[in-house]
């Protein structure tokens, strides 16, 4: 028999984690002052008047480097729970994690050879 009461803590945290940000945004919307003037609408740059254009173009190398970083950051998110419960899961999950890491290594070698990790 599948027992639903085991998930009560999960549902409580889920409801609370959805409710608190909604409540915070609602309260700040009611309490925030509404004064829109020319000074309020101007851009702020370290307390002085902005110099030059506000629009800046980044090079494509930055985006490639950031994308590779995000991929390996997500890898850490997936591997951390596996590492914490390694002794319980057994050898089959170890093989799956090994395949996952090997795919990521192949991807990093591919990105390296394509020059995505070079900044010059």
Swiss-Prot record:
Give the main EC class: translocase
Keywords annotated in UniProt: Chloroplast, Membrane, NAD, NADP, Plastid, Plastoquinone, Quinone, Thylakoid, Translocase, Transmembrane, Transmembrane helix, Transport
Q: Which InterPro entries match?
A: NAD(P)H_OxRDtase_bac/plastid, NADH_UbQ/plastoQ_OxRdtase_su3, NDAH_ubi_oxred_su3_sf
Q: What is its EC number?
A: 7.1.1.-
Q: List the disulfide bonds.
A: none
What are the transmembrane regions?
Answer: 9-29, 64-84, 88-108
Task: Spell out the Gene3D superfamilies in the cross-references.
Answer: NADH:ubiquinone/plastoquinone oxidoreductase, chain 3 (1.20.58.1610)
Q: Which GO terms of type biological process are on file?
A: photosynthesis, light reaction
Gene Ontology, cellular component aspect: chloroplast thylakoid membrane; NADH dehydrogenase complex
Where it sits in the cell: the answer is:
Plastid, Chloroplast thylakoid membrane
Where is it chiefly localized?
plastid
- The answer to whether UniProt assigns keyword Plastid to this entry is yes
For molecular function, the Gene Ontology terms on record are:
NADH dehydrogenase (ubiquinone) activity; quinone binding
What is the membrane topology noted in the UniProt record heading this document? Answer: Multi-pass membrane protein
> Is NADP included in the keywords of this UniProt record?
yes
* Catalytic reactions of this protein: a plastoquinone + NADH + (n+1) H(+)(in) = a plastoquinol + NAD(+) + n H(+)(out); a plastoquinone + NADPH + (n+1) H(+)(in) = a plastoquinol + NADP(+) + n H(+)(out)
Pfam families associated with the record: Oxidored_q4
Q: Which family does it belong to?
A: Belongs to the complex I subunit 3 family.
Record's subunit section:
NDH is composed of at least 16 different subunits, 5 of which are encoded in the nucleus.
What does this gene product do?
Answer: NDH shuttles electrons from NAD(P)H:plastoquinone, via FMN and iron-sulfur (Fe-S) centers, to quinones in the photosynthetic chain and possibly in a chloroplast respiratory chain. The immediate electron acceptor for the enzyme in this species is believed to be plastoquinone. Couples the redox reaction to proton translocation, and thus conserves the redox energy in a proton gradient.
Return the protein name: NAD(P)H-quinone oxidoreductase subunit 3, chloroplastic
